[in-house]
């Protein structure tokens, strides 16, 4: 099994979730986060009437799903179709091995099933 984590702009989350569902990924977790990548950070004000300054972080979201090894290429292709824009700061996708899963309802551990 593999953990696929797509770090995308907040406006892309629904598209990524729809793409995952369309290819048969059975679930996903969405996490809001801040980070410093190569993308330009927005100009913001700390409060009304204060001068503009560059934000320290960009706001992004991680869409995380666990899939069988055989689905990884399909999932990556589906994400790329809806997210790849050619512009800096669009995000990244990481793939990690998942050695074991523990179901917290039953306490059952498994190396090959969700």
What are these regions (language model features)?
Residues 1-114:
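Positively charged, small/polar-rich N-terminal and surface patches that mediate targeting and assembly
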């Amino acid at each position: 099994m593999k953990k696929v984590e797509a770090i995308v702009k907040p406006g892309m989350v629904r598209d990524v979730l729809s793409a995952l569902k369309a290819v048969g990924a059975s679930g996903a977790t969405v996490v809001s986060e801040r980070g410093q990548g190569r993308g330009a950070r927005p100009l913001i004000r700390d409060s009304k009437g204060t001068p503009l300054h560059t934000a320290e972080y960009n706001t992004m979201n991680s869409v995380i799903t666990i899939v069988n090894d055989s689905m990884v290429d399909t999932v990556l292709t589906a994400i790329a179709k809806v997210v790849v824009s050619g512009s800096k700061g669009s995000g990244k996708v990481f793939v990690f091995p998942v050695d074991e899963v523990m179901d917290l309802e039953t306490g059952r551990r498994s190396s090959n099933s969700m």
